[in-house]
Each structure stands twice: as structure tokens, then as C-alpha cells.
């Protein structure tokens, strides 16, 4: 067959950042103006951790661009009634009409005051997966900055059901919004549910493959054999939600069955709170004058403040102390005369002694011999005393790490898990040292692009922390947002990301019903709600109830790609030009999420590879128009000049590419200025590159020292200690929060307050789910199985479920066609592979095909991704189940940080019919 040769073929460099495993570099092949292929960008092979490769999701972007189900013009709702069974009656309108509608609503809202009568913002916004929508929303963050207070309380699950507790405790302990292994140098990794071969993108897959070739060992501890488990040296099928017991037993082996000098004694003594003396009231013994914590000086045989010059602190022991004080909640000072002072390390050893492998075996269903062997392998691999040289600096080499996955590091039990994981690193000196357990980035602290700069001296020799106030004068008795993050969760702070990481389920739940004795203002709805790249009607819990709440919102504006289950309730759909059709610059490199540890840092351009389909518009163009029509143009431009577009300020000490605050600026003018400013800053004034340069080259980076991967050298340079093992500050803060709540007759958060402890204790974590069943009026014996959710590389963030190519590829990976179930358990229920089954919790049911496997515990079911769609084209026809449909939103199952977990007790039964190809 004769074909006409193309008139033009281009390869356009851009990036994919559709999930937190990005950014990945790629090129788009464009033939005669049509995108035909996505390819790796091998020009980035030397600077990108995945050598210029992208993951499977990026290959669906061509089909996403030309999806016949796309919304191609603004749409207005004509049916005033909202609900799943109400046809919205969307009709196409012009951009002028759409933008005027939004602008008038915003101006009316602003005229009433940006805060409503209860003191919370009238404008709310919800964005999806892990901050990644910001990589596609152009200058919209600058508009939000210009507006003022925004309520981000209404989450879509990406906070509280993500790796939530790790975010909060990780940043508190070692500036680690997320935590990863230093895979490039690690020899032994214990992974508790961290499914990095699915959720870590090509960067993690590449690095772990290289590590296996190098000979490292990964032990995967989880109830089912995930993709990561299948790629590991060993799979340990642990009982769901018993991970703290397993890790406590590992610590027992190290602390009780080995000698103290087999640990990293210098690290424990000099970089942690281990030598601090604890008094009989469980608080630090302090110098009566300076109030600094005391240590026992082995050189002078007396207690002295921890920072005394030339001090030689005792790591362990008990000592007679006189003339000290302790400081409790609300600055209550107690005199401590003739008391015993015990080092925090000795308190730890005594605390952990009861948690033997034999004790843990009965709880987590892992043989004691296996627990003991894994602990001993970990200690041997730690190579305590070894060093390595990085950029001329000699550092400890501790090639062991412990990493946690979703539902291990969030919800009840997560505090204990995060503490134990971090302590396992501390004991061998592997925290923030080469080969060990590392933090990736910061979001609750600033600056976001360099976690080292967030390390500043604070009280008691630790890093400065920015907790929400719990003292009587400053505690936020009146919530500043609908999820009450500032009122209930001190550790989350009050920076830009804090609200989205508060207990967002409370914002949804309290719209329906407040807890008994809440003694809080009646929750209000926002006047306007913006949503983008988020679908809480599918991605949160108890979704059928959530839909009813969404339907009550008075005015919802959705930046929309297709109709979905959330924007089905919207009043206005604004179609943005998507991934391959619009322009934006972002930061790349440094250290960022998952395993994105780079040896470079810089910026990358997402550019218009093809013309926008229909009447869709660049997000920056939409934002410009909103700013102009709402009278916020000057404030908006000033926000862009400050760097609110997400890269660099447009004016610095030696450069000025500022926009005229009073003028209107086309998207390409804005991004040209950003390109120039970013390259000037990165090159320290040596180069200034414009938008046209980036359209050709795609990215610009400069080398970065690998020393920036590791926080311990920064801690040492500033003479700071990690706030481990003893959690005295959290204990005091928790007591202070209890005082405030009880003064205001609020007892409904008491169970969460129980989590504030100096040394975490095991409590019956799985039993909390049984208790919740009983309290809901159900019988525990009726729901004998655990249902878990697991990540899928093909559907990592869930935003691409409407792309047929993803379905086609996913069918090659087991589990993407239904509910993974143990084959012997299935036989007991008379269920064969491919049978249609009902999975029911005490609040509802979800349906799908049985996918039988041996690599899953008999008491466990697993569903990949999040489905059960009923509005989104293509996805609604997949007949796929979802845990979210049947997992309750529950105050009872919310921990002290405000998080829950993707886990629910269920029953299962066979339905009529067989679903062909279910095992694919």
C-alpha cells in the first residue's frame, strides 16, 4: 500500500508529572501536527535518575489528548438539582460567558468578606494527588495567593489515606516529608508494604534493578505478594495492621540480644536525645536555671546541661539527681530533688524488653525465628564503623534501610511504625547517612526546594519546629478551616501544605453530623469550590455518602478533562488544554518524593507539542482572565513576580525580569520571564536562557553535590540532635492539647490524645477495626476477612482510568481485573477464578471478578487502584470494584495526626455469572 510521506516530523521535549514518582523526561513525536508517540528523552540520560525514561502512564498521553470523550468547550449546568441520579444537563457556552459567571460569583463572594461568619474561608479548593496538579495548573497558584485565605479542608484522600503519618512525623524527626532507602548504596532493605516497584516509577525500578545486580537484599513484609514482593529476595506474609509488633521485635533483638557497643554508640550519644536524663514524672530533668535537659557527664561524674563544653555524656545508666526541675504542659515547673535520672536510651531498652520475637509471633503471624534472623541480618549488613567519601567528605556508611508503605505509615499504628522505622535506623547510625534511611523533601517546612535550609537550632538541642500553638493564649479554639487542622493537630503546623494534610475526612463528615459534645461552630459550606485533577467521589472513603455531601455545595467550578463522578455535581466545567497542549515550567532535581534523588537540580519545560483540541485553553490563560475579571490582576502579577508560579522570583539581587503589575501578560510572556529568571539563578548569573531555548532543549540543570542527600552532616555542623528515641516534646504537647480541649468541654478527641506518648506502646491495632464494627451495630464474626488496597503503576494516581491503553496494558499485570483472593479461601467459599463476587462491609458492597492467587494471606483480599466509576466515560464500563465504596469515614478509625487507612473488614460471597479473562 502506498503511503504519503509526512510533511513534518518533530520530537518535542517535555515532561510527565502525573504522579508523585515524577518528574520524568520524555519527547513527543509529532507528525504533521498530530502527536503519535511518546518516547524517552535520552538527552537526559546522564542527569535523570531513570536515564531519561518514563513510566507506562506517560504513554497514554497521546490517547488522552485525542480522547473522544473530552470536554472541549466550557459547560454550564442547567439542572439546579444535584445528585448521582440527577442529569446535570450540561450545555456548551462561550469562554466569555463562563469566565464572567465565575468572576461575578467570586466578586460577590469577596464583597461579603473572604472569611464567613464562622471564621473560615468562603473560597475552597481541592487538588489531587500529592501536589502534582500544581505541575499542570500554570499560574493558578499565583491567583490563589492573590485572593487570600483558601480552605483546602475538603480532601480527596491524597492526604489522610496516603502516607500521612510519615509526612508529619518524618518532617518532625528528620525533615522527611517522605522517606526512602538510599538504594544506590544500600545492601539490605526491609520494606513493610512499600510497593516501590509499582509506585516508585522508572527511577525506583531502575535503581532497585541495579541494586539487585549489585547483590543487595530486600525483604518485603506485607499480607500479599505485590509486584515489589515478587521482585524481592524474601516475602514475609504478615497479618494486616500488625507491623508495629514486627518492628518492635526487631528492635528487641538489637537492644536486648546484642550488646550496647554493637550499636552505633557515637551516633546515639552525640546525634540523638539518648543521653538526656528522664525523671520519675516521665519528663526530662532540666537545669533549674537554664531549663536545658541534663545529661550525666562521665568526666566529672555529675549532671550537667547537655551542651556543656567538653561534656562526655553517659549513653545508659541511672543516676541520683538533686536540684533539677521538670517542665510539663502549660509550663508547669516541678522541683526534682533527690530523684533518679534515667537516660532516655536506658528507658528505651527497658521499654522494648517486653517485645520479644516470641511475643510478636502471636500477633503478626511471623515465626519468631524469622524475625530474629531478619534483625540479625540487618545489624550485620549495617557495617557499623564503615565510612565512605563523598565529594571529599568522609561520612559513615550504613547500607541498611527500613521503608514503609501506605496503610502502614498512616492510620492507627502508624505512629508506632514511623517511630520504630526511624529508631531502627538510629540504632545503627543509618539515619540520614549514606546507604541508610533518608528523607526526600519538605512540605510542612520551608524552603521546599532545600530541606537543609529548614534545619535551624531550636529548643533542647533539637531542630526548631513550627507546631500549632497549644498554650491557652494562642490555641485556635475557633477553627480556621473546616478540617480543624490548627485546632486538633499541633504537629502539622500551619504552612501552605498543612491544611491539606489535616484530618480532611472531618470536613466531609461534619457537614453531615458532628460528634456528640463537639462544642464547635456549625460547619458551613464554601460559597465557591474549585476542583482540579481530583475526584473525591471515587478516591475518598464512603463514596456514596460523600457524593450526597458534594451535591450540597452551592457553586462548584471544575477544571475538567472529561465528566467524572465529582464534577457531575459541578455548576461549571472549564476545559483546560492538557499535558501536551499547554506551557509550564517546573523545578526538577535535587531530592523529591519517592526515590527522586538526583545529582543535578534545575528546571524543565512542559510545552505545547500539538494544538489544543476544541476550545480548550491554557491554564495560565484561564488564570489571567480570572485575575483580570475579578479585579485582582495587580495582586496576581505581583504574586508571579514573587515566585508564586512555582519556580523562581522574577527579580533578584542581580537580575530583574519582573512583569508590569498593572499589565496583562500572555502565557508565553509569563513563562519566558520565568525561564530567564530560573536560568539566571541556577547559573549564578552566567547564563540567561529564554523560552525559545527551552522549547528546543526541554530542560536546564546544574550539578549538585550528593552531600545534599544526607541531613546528618548538616545536623552535626549545627550541633543538633535528632529528637529520638524519647518523645518528651510530643508528650507535653499532647497534655497541653488535652487541657485546651477539656477546658472547652470537648472530649470527642480523647482517644486520639492517647497516641501522645514518650515511648510508643503496642496496642491492639487490628482490634480497633473489630471494635468499630461492634460500635456500628455489626457482628465481628460476620466480617472475617481484611480488604486492602494496593498501588498500580498503570493507575497510580487514578486520573487516567478513562484511557483505554492503560486498561490494555494493565490486563497484563495480575489483579487488574477484580479482587485478589487466596485460592484456598476461595475454595472454601465455592469461588472459582473469574467468578463474580460481592465484597461487603458493614456499610455497603462492591463487586468484581475473583482473581485467585497463592501469594496472599488466607484472611486477606486486595483490590488494586480505585474504581467503581459510574459517570466517567470508559471507566464506568469496566465493572471494577473499589475499597473506597465500602470503607467508612470514621472518627473512631482516625489517629492523632488525623489520618486513616485503606483497610476494612469484609465478608465475601459468590454472585451469579463468570467474568472471562479475570486472571489476565
Residue ranges and their predicted role:
Residues 2, 13, 114, 145, ...:
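Thiamine diphosphate
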Residues 77-97, 101-102, 110-115, 252, ...:
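N-terminal leader/propeptide and maturation segments of large enzyme subunits in energy/redox metabolism
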Residues 604-673, 803-820, 824-920:
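Long, contiguous, secondary-structure-rich segments that constitute the structural scaffold
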Amino acid at each position: 500500500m502506498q503511503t504519503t510521506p509526512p510533511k513534518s516530523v518533530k520530537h518535542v521535549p517535555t515532561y510527565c508529572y502525573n504522579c508523585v514518582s515524577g518528574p520524568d523526561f520524555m519527547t513527543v513525536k509529532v507528525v504533521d501536527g498530530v502527536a503519535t508517540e511518546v518516547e524517552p528523552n535520552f538527552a537526559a540520560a546522564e542527569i535523570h535518575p531513570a536515564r531519561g525514561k518514563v513510566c507506562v502512564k506517560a504513554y497514554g498521553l497521546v490517547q488522552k489528548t485525542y480522547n473522544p470523550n473530552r470536554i472541549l468547550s466550557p459547560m454550564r449546568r442547567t439542572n439546579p438539582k444535584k445528585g448521582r441520579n440527577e442529569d446535570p444537563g450540561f450545555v456548551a457556552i462561550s469562554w466569555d460567558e463562563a469566565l464572567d459567571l465565575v468572576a461575578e460569583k467570586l466578586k460577590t463572594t469577596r464583597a461579603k468578606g473572604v472569611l464567613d461568619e464562622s471564621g473560615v474561608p468562603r473560597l475552597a479548593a481541592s487538588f489531587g494527588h500529592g501536589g502534582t496538579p500544581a505541575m499542570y495548573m500554570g499560574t493558578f497558584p499565583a491567583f490563589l495567593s492573590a485572593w487570600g485565605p483558601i480552605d483546602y479542608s475538603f480532601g480527596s484522600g491524597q492526604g489522610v489515606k496516603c502516607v500521612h503519618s510519615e509526612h508529619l512525623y518524618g518532617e518532625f524527626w528528620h525533615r522527611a516529608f517522605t522517606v526512602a532507602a538510599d538504594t544506590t548504596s544500600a545492601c539490605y532493605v526491609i520494606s513493610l508494604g512499600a510497593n516501590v516497584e509499582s509506585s516508585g516509577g522508572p527511577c525506583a525500578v531502575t535503581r532497585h534493578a541495579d541494586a539487585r545486580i549489585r547483590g543487595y537484599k530486600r525483604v518485603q513484609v506485607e499480607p500479599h505478594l505485590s509486584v515489589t514482593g515478587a521482585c524481592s529476595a524474601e516475602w514475609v506474609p504478615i497479618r494486616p495492621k500488625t507491623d508495629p509488633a514486627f518492628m518492635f521485635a526487631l528492635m528487641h533483638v538489637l537492644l536486648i540480644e546484642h550488646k550496647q557497643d554493637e550499636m552505633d554508640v557515637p551516633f546515639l550519644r552525640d546525634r540523638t536525645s539518648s543521653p538526656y536524663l528522664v525523671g520519675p514524672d516521665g519528663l526530662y530533668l532540666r537545669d533549674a536555671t537554664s531549663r536545658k535537659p541534663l545529661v550525666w557527664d562521665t568526666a566529672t561524674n555529675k549532671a550537667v546541661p547537655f551542651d556543656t563544653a567538653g561534656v562526655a555524656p553517659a549513653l545508659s545508666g541511672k543516676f541520683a539527681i538533686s536540684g533539677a526541675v521538670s517542665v510539663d504542659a502549660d509550663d508547669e515547673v516541678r522541683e526534682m530533688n533527690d530523684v533518679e535520672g534515667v537516660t532516655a536510651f536506658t528507658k528505651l531498652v527497658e521499654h522494648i524488653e517486653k517485645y520479644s520475637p516470641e511475643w510478636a509471633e502471636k500477633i503478626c503471624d511471623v515465626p519468631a525465628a524469622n524475625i530474629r534472623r531478619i534483625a540479625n541480618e540487618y545489624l550485620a549488613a549495617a557495617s557499623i564503623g564503615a565510612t565512605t567519601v563523598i565529594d571529599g567528605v568522609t561520612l559513615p556508611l550504613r547500607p541498611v534501610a527500613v521503608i514503609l508503605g501506605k496503610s502502614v505509615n498512616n492510620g492507627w499504628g502508624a505512629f508506632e511504625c514511623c517511630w520504630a522505622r526511624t529508631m531502627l535506623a538510629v540504632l545503627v547510625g543509618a539515619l540520614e547517612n549514606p546507604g541508610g534511611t533518608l528523607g526526600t523533601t519538605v512540605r510542612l517546612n520551608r524552603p521546599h526546594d532545600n530541606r537543609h535550609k529548614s534545619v535551624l537550632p531550636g529548643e533542647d538541642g533539637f531542630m526548631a519546629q513550627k507546631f500549632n500553638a497549644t498554650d491557652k493564649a494562642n490555641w485556635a479554639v475557633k477553627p480556621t478551616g473546616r478540617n480543624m487542622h490548627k485546632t486538633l493537630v499541633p504537629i502539622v503546623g500551619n504552612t501552605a501544605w498543612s491544611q491539606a494534610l489535616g484530618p480532611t475526612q472531618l470536613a466531609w463528615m461534619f457537614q453531615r453530623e458532628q460528634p456528640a459534645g463537639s462544642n464547635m461552630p456549625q460547619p458551613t459550606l464554601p460559597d465557591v469550590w474549585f476542583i482540579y485533577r481530583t475526584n473525591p467521589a471515587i478516591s475518598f472513603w464512603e463514596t456514596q455518602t460523600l457524593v450526597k455531601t458534594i451535591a450540597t455545595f452551592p457553586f462548584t467550578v471544575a477544571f475538567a478533562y472529561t465528566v467524572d463522578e465529582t464534577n457531575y455535581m459541578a455548576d461549571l466545567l472549564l476545559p483546560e488544554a492538557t499535558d501536551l497542549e499547554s506551557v509550564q515550567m517546573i523545578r526538577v532535581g535535587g531530592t523529591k518524593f519517592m526515590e527522586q534523588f538526583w545529582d543535578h537540580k534545575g528546571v524543565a519545560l512542559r510545552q505545547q507539542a500539538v494544538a489544543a483540541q476544541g476550545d480548550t485553553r491554557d491554564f495560565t490563560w484561564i488564570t489571567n482572565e480570572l485575575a483580570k475579571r475579578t479585579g485582582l490582576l495587580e495582586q496576581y502579577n505581583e504574586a508571579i513576580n514573587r515566585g508564586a508560579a512555582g519556580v523562581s522570583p522574577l527579580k533578584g539581587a542581580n537580575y530583574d525580569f519582573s512583569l508590569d503589575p498593572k499589565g496583562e501578560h500572555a502565557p508565553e510572556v509569563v513563562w519566558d520571564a520565568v525561564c530567564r529568571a530560573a536560568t539566571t539563578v541556577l547559573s549564578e548569573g552566567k547564563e540567561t536562557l529564554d523560552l525559545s531555548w527551552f522549547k528546543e532543549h526541554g530542560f536546564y540543570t546544574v550539578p549538585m553535590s550528593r552531600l545534599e542527600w544526607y541531613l546528618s552532616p548538616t545536623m552535626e555542623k549545627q550541633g543538633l540532635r535528632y529528637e529520638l528515641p524519647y518523645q518528651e516534646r510530643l508528650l507535653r504537647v499532647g497534655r497541653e492539647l488535652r487541657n485546651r480541649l477539656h477546658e472547652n468541654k470537648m472530649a470527642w478527641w480523647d482517644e486520639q490524645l492517647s497516641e501522645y506518648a514518650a515511648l510508643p506502646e503496642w496496642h491492639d491495632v487490628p482490634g480497633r477495626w473489630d471494635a468499630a464494627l461492634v460500635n456500628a451495630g455489626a457482628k465481628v464474626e460476620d466480617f472475617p476477612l481484611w480488604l486492602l488496597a494496593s498501588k498500580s503503576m498503570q493507575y497510580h494516581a487514578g486520573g487516567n482510568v478513562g484511557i483505554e491503553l492503560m486498561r490494555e496494558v494493565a490486563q497484563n499485570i495480575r489483579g487488574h481485573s477484580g479482587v485478589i483472593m487466596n485460592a484456598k479461601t476461595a475454595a472454601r467459599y465455592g469461588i472459582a477464578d473469574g467468578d463474580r463476587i460481592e465484597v461487603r462491609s458493614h456499610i455497603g458492597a462492591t463487586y468484581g471478578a475473583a482473581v485467585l492467587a497463592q501469594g496472599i494471606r488466607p484472611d486477606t483480599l486486595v483490590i488494586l487502584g480505585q474504581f467503581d466509576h459510574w459517570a466517567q466515560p470508559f471507566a464506568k464500563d469496566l465493572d471494577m470494584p473499589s475499597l473506597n465504596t465500602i470503607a467508612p469515614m470514621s472518627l473512631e478509625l482516625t489517629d492523632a495526626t488525623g489520618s486513616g487507612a485503606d483497610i476494612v473488614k469484609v465478608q465475601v460471597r459468590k454472585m451469579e455469572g463468570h467474568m472471562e479473562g479475570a486472571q489476565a
